Amino acid sequence: MAKMLRFSEEARRALERGVDAVADAVKITLGPKGRNVVIEKSWGSPTITNDGVSIAKEIELEDKFENLGAQLVKEVASKTNDVAGDGTTTATVLAQAMIKEGIKNVTAGANPILVKRGIDKAVAAAVEKIKDISKKLSNSDDIAHVASISANSEEIGKLIAEAMEKVGEDGVITVEDSKSIDTFVEFTEGMQFDRGYISPYFVTDPEKMEVVYNEPFILITDRKLSNIKPLIPILEKVAQTGKPLVIIAEDVEGEALTTLVLNKLKGTLNTVAVKAPGFGDRRKAMLQDIAILTGGIVASEEVGINLEDLTLNDLGRADVVRVKKDETIIVGGHGDQEEIKKRIAQIKAQIEQTTSEYEKETLQERMAKLAGGVAVIKVGAATETELKEKKHRIEDALSATRAAVEEGIVPGGGITLLRARKPVEKIVEELDGDEKIGAKIVYEALSAPINQIAKNAGYDGAIIIHKVLEQDDPAYGFDALKGEYCDMFERGIIDPAKVTRSALQNAASIAGMLLTTEVLVVEKPEPKNNNPMPEMPEY
């Protein structure tokens, strides 16, 4: 396949045009008075959105060189979205501002490598300032504020705050479609896994077809149980206490299952057998989680624990165990809190090390179950288009809220980035030559988001910037919705610090890469055949 090449200034100009195409489409959505963008879909109804990353992902340019620039800006938006769940539009606006100024200076003869070095130094200083300004979230109202701003809805903000309060910092919150038009939170307390009773004869509530035991003993093993003999000693010990027994094993069959069912039906021993969750190594890890949560041990051949030797101390305990046809819930495990915390810390470390998204999700789910539960936000709407848009907003708001809990909050509305110009100004004074130019580019770019917010709301950005900088209070800023100057924290105009930091760092990273690009290589499009009819063969 033949290639096409572009060099130096011509290459950078093509990239800039691609960047502008995406940034101009995205930046009109910034701020409380940002506009919407309607995106045509190849099937189904069009999508109406004001989410930066959704818009950026849809843009594909015809000119292959310009399209490279567009793809780079998409990278800024999606990287910021992956890390912080929000701030994609801010990141795009910052990247465009840095690239515009950078290309101007590089074209005038500045060394792109030194310019990039200056950009990096200035960004490091700005990030420190963002950390200084940030405030930790103190209560549920703060969480609701952050979520409301990101989702542009107080109702959604309250739902997310309620869900986070219930499941805690490490809990899992998922977003699903509701069967009605209402949006609400469903909460599953305790450890829940998708395995139910092996036989319906274990059922204690025939109406609901479920097994409910209070204060049961829990036997946990990774073996397949078919012979009853190894179980008899522990079954006798449990029967003497008068408490029920829950058996979680790889499988229970044959003689073992028959004996357990008969004991249950005669009332000798209330029991239920449940298949262990997961497969392979994941099953072993989940059984260990259940053991730690309930204060028991896993009777495993690998560690040489025989079923005949088990004592009551080796069994787990819980306040309630509820078993349905294909679901088991363990509520109020009696495990040692310190051990549970250690296990959660261990899973957290695994999450940080893994690169697989699927692995990350399963680890987070395990952590949530240990931490105390899973919340599901059920999203309802009148039409499919509204449902898609609402679901997307909730997912975004959820990520932004988690980011706020992690690194705290800063004043929103582009104010924090504007305040971060102060330390950058010092860097500009300290540096010289082309590095100074790089730092100056960042200094100018930091005012781009507030400028755009003001423009979208119909105000003059330069006047607002001047007015805001007259006050030294980092929280003092401009409410573009009401057209008033105010304390941004008091007014509830806040952003997660992680979102602001990620937006700046990702924008600078792409700008630096783009400025140091000297050659573009793309595939040459194949010439189209204007004669679609095949030639007739000659006979």
Swiss-Prot record:
It catalyses: ATP + H2O + a folded polypeptide = ADP + phosphate + an unfolded polypeptide. It comes from Thermosipho melanesiensis (strain DSM 12029 / CIP 104789 / BI429). Coiled coil: none annotated. GO terms for molecular function: ATP binding; ATP-dependent protein folding chaperone; isomerase activity; unfolded protein binding. SUPFAM superfamilies: GroEL apical domain-like (SSF52029), GroEL equatorial domain-like (SSF48592), GroEL-intermediate domain like (SSF54849). Its main location: cytoplasm. Forms a cylinder of 14 subunits composed of two heptameric rings stacked back-to-back. Interacts with the co-chaperonin GroES. Keywords: ATP-binding, Chaperone, Cytoplasm, Isomerase, Nucleotide-binding. ATP binds at T29, L30, G31, P32, D86, G87, T88, T89, T90, G413, D479, A480, L481, D495. GO terms for biological process: protein refolding. Belongs to the chaperonin (HSP60) family. Its EC number is 5.6.1.7. It comes from the Bacteria. It is found in: Cytoplasm. NCBIfam families: GroEL (TIGR02348), PRK00013.1 (NF000592), PRK12849.1 (NF009487), PRK12850.1 (NF009488), PRK12851.1 (NF009489). It holds the Pfam family Cpn60_TCP1. GO terms for cellular component: cytoplasm. This is Chaperonin GroEL. PROSITE patterns: CHAPERONINS_CPN60.
